[in-house]
């Protein structure tokens, strides 16, 4: 049996990192993953302040720790301290703009301010990094929109790697897309 996939969950929030209030984004991501993933997985969770260096370091650390997927929550708006996309772009060798485009497209159906969101995605080492908004409802909407592509993207990132992680979804909840020959 293969080892569980390790998924990084990174909450970006000044207030949550100080303990001023409970993190809601990280638990929302964890609950979503538990709902849609059929394959074994474990979480590596972190909370950091809205600081570009802290965010970049956490993404690099999670990638180095073997996370095949790093999902961030928070810090994607236009406010001065919203720097998660910049930190992501700093550490990723390849950007995958389609993820952000799709999330904004879907979110605009719910709220006109989704146009202010700057989510992005990219590849850091052998990790797919995906930025999500901070609100649990928006996290679910965005993950429903992009998660069908995530397992195959993880497969592609791990091309040629011995014993790559394999993310399998619960088809009754979410059908992941993989080409027939994959």
Model-inferred region functions:
Residues 1-182:
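Non-catalytic beta/alpha edge segments that cap or flank active sites
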């Amino acid at each position: 049996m293969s080892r569980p996939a390790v998924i990084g969950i990174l909450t970006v929030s000044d207030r949550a990192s100080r303990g001023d209030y409970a993190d809601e984004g990280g638990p929302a991501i964890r609950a979503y993953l538990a709902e849609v993933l059929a394959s074994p997985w474990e979480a590596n969770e972190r909370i950091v302040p809205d600081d570009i260096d802290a965010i970049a370091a956490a993404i690099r650390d999670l990638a180095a720790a073997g996370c095949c997927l790093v999902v961030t929550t928070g810090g994607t708006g236009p406010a001065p301290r919203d720097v998660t996309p910049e930190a992501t772009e700093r550490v990723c060798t390849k950007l995958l703009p389609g993820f952000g485009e799709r999330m904004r497209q879907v979110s605009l159906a719910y709220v006109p301010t989704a146009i202010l969101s700057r989510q992005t995605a990219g590849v850091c080492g052998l990790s797919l990094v995906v930025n999500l908004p901070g609100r649990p409802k928006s996290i679910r909407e965005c993950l429903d929109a992009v998660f069908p592509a995530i397992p195959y993207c993880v497969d592609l990132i791990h091309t040629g790697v011995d014993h790559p992680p394999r993310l399998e979804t619960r088809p009754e909840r979410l059908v992941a897309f993989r080409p027939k020959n994959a």
